[in-house]
């Protein structure tokens, strides 16, 4: 726990120093990116883009997607607006952390398809703070899979075995999730237990 605190202390949140540029019809909702509510979001059409002016110390960008992006690109820009790095967002992850190169003055996020973002953060560290709970994609063929119906069921019914699910060879899968917040809570629980593999969310309608 002390090590986690030290890691977070080394990463400074620079989000307040950034300038966010949104399409005109959603510009008034910029505060949704930092309200800590994963169910609030700003949606973009396939033709719209988000740009962020970042300070010189910026080294990492956190994006909490409302749904896993289907075709999004994160571009780092220099002071003249030239692209100096391009990275495709992982289509299987709800939360991403993207390293910004030296000389980065801005970031542009766009997609070949519609997308939505719940939270944004800019930090002065290439390594994501532990509090963000950044995870990796589950293995294609894990040795063990724990399948539960709803988010929250894993703790209620299987709480005693969850500590043993931290291995990368174990996948936790949810048939349905009540909300994006519920998905985030499931991610944070698995992360706290030591897992670095994001749970699988099948996406069936909640009932």
Model-derived regions: residue spans:
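Active-site rim/loop-helix segments in enzyme catalytic domains that contact anionic ligands
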Residues: 39, 70, 87-88, 92-97, ...
């Amino acid at each position: 726990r002390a090590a986690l605190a030290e890691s977070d202390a080394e990463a400074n949140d620079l989000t307040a120093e950034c300038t966010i540029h949104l399409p005109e019809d959603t510009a008034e909702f910029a505060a949704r990116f930092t309200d800590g509510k994963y169910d609030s979001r700003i949606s973009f059409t396939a033709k719209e883009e988000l740009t962020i002016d970042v300070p010189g110390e910026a080294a990492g960008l956190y994006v909490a997607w409302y749904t896993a992006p289907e075709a999004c690109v994160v571009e780092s820009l220099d002071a003249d607006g030239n692209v100096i790095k391009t990275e495709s967002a992982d289509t299987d992850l709800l939360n991403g952390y993207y390293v910004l190169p030296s000389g980065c003055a801005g970031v542009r996020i766009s997609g070949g398809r519609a997308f939505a973002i719940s939270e944004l953060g800019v930090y002065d560290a290439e390594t994501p703070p532990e509090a963000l709970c950044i995870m990796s994609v589950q293995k294609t063929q894990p040795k063990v899979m724990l399948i539960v119906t709803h988010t929250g069921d894993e703790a209620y019914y299987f709480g005693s075995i969850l500590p043993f699910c931290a291995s990368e060879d174990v996948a936790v899968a949810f048939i349905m999730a009540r909300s994006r917040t519920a998905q985030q809570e499931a991610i944070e629980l698995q992360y706290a237990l030591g897992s670095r593999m994001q749970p699988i969310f099948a996406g069936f309608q909640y009932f």
